[in-house]
């Protein structure tokens, strides 16, 4: 059975929050990631954000 764990009350992080992620794939527009501290929900980091 898969365990589910959340570290924060909110379902999603706020803008400008720093979170731990696992990169799932890299595409032309950016990277698809799993947000480790938010029950592994999927997110996307745009390429323009990665280059900052």
Curated annotation (Swiss-Prot):
Residues recorded as bearing Phosphoserine in the entry: 48, 51
Protein's name according to its UniProt entry: Eukaryotic translation initiation factor 2 subunit 1
Which UniProt key words apply to this protein? Cytoplasm, Initiation factor, Mitochondrion, Phosphoprotein, Protein biosynthesis, RNA-binding, Translation regulation
> Where in or outside the cell is it found?
Cytoplasm, Stress granule; Cytoplasm, Cytosol; Mitochondrion
Instruction: Note how its activity is modulated.
Output: This results in the global attenuation of 5' cap-dependent protein synthesis and concomitant translation of ISR-specific mRNAs that contain a short upstream open reading frame (uORF) in their 5' UTR, such as ATF4, ATF5, DDIT3/CHOP and PPP1R15A/GADD34.
Specify the species.
Answer: Oryctolagus cuniculus (Rabbit)
Task: Tell me the gene name.
Answer: EIF2S1
| Principal location listed in the UniProt entry | cytoplasm
Q: What Pfam families would the database entry show? A: S1
Q: How is this chain modified after translation?
A: Phosphorylation at Ser-48 and Ser-51 stabilizes the eIF-2/GDP/eIF2B complex and prevents GDP/GTP exchange reaction, thus impairing the recycling of eIF-2 between successive rounds of initiation and leading to global inhibition of translation, while concomitantly initiating the preferential translation of integrated stress response (ISR)-specific mRNAs. Substrate for at least 4 kinases: EIF2AK1/HRI, EIF2AK2/PKR, EIF2AK3/PERK and EIF2AK4/GCN2. Phosphorylation on Ser-51 by the EIF2AK4/GCN2 protein kinase occurs in response to amino acid starvation and UV irradiation.
List the InterPro entries hit by this protein, alphabetically: NA-bd_OB-fold, S1_domain, TIF_2_asu
The GO biological-process annotations, alphabetized, read as:
cellular response to amino acid starvation; cellular response to UV; HRI-mediated signaling; mitophagy; negative regulation of translational initiation in response to stress; PERK-mediated unfolded protein response; response to endoplasmic reticulum stress; translational initiation
In what residue span(s) does the S1 motif domain sit? 16-52
């Amino acid at each position: 059975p898969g365990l589910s764990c959340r570290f924060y009350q909110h379902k999603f992080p706020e803008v400008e929050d720093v979170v731990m992620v696992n990169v799932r794939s890299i595409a032309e527009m950016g990277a698809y990631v799993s947000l480790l501290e938010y029950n592994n929900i999927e997110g996307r980091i745009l390429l323009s954000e990665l280059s900052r």
